[in-house]
Amino acid sequence: MAQELSEKELLKMEVEQLKKEVKNPRALISKTGKEIKDYVEAEAGNDPLLKGIPEDKNPFKEKGGCMIS
């Protein structure tokens, strides 16, 4: 699709995207980094990658063997 558009059209699209992005609120990383760290530490107990999945609730556990007769 990008090959079908002229350079002028591509630049217009880029300007429109930048106009949308400039409206996004910005925050200092010193503040947001701490908030993210606190959130991750608070939710670590609920993370199945950290604490594992109980065998009875594991959807990927093999249900049974394969029988060939």
Swiss-Prot record:
Domain of life: Eukaryota
Residues recorded with modification Cysteine methyl ester: 66
GO molecular function, one term: G-protein beta-subunit binding
GO CC entries: heterotrimeric G-protein complex
Lipidation (S-farnesyl cysteine): 66
UniProt keyword terms in alphabetical order: Cell membrane, Lipoprotein, Membrane, Methylation, Prenylation, Transducer
Membrane topology, as annotated: Lipid-anchor
Region (Disordered): 47-69
BP terms from Gene Ontology: G protein-coupled receptor signaling pathway
Chief location: membrane
Alphabetized InterPro entries for the sequence: G-protein_gamma-like_dom (IPR015898), GGL_sf (IPR036284), Gprotein-gamma (IPR001770)
Pfam families (alphabetical): G-gamma (PF00631)
PROSITE patterns hit by this protein: G_PROTEIN_GAMMA
Cell compartment(s), UniProt: Cell membrane
Residues cleaved off as propeptide: 67-69
Family membership noted in the UniProt record: Belongs to the G protein gamma family.
Protein task: Guanine nucleotide-binding proteins (G proteins) are involved as a modulator or transducer in various transmembrane signaling systems. The beta and gamma chains are required for the GTPase activity, for replacement of GDP by GTP, and for G protein-effector interaction.
Record's subunit section: G proteins are composed of 3 units, alpha, beta and gamma.
Protein name: Guanine nucleotide-binding protein G(I)/G(S)/G(O) subunit gamma-T2
Organism: Canis lupus familiaris
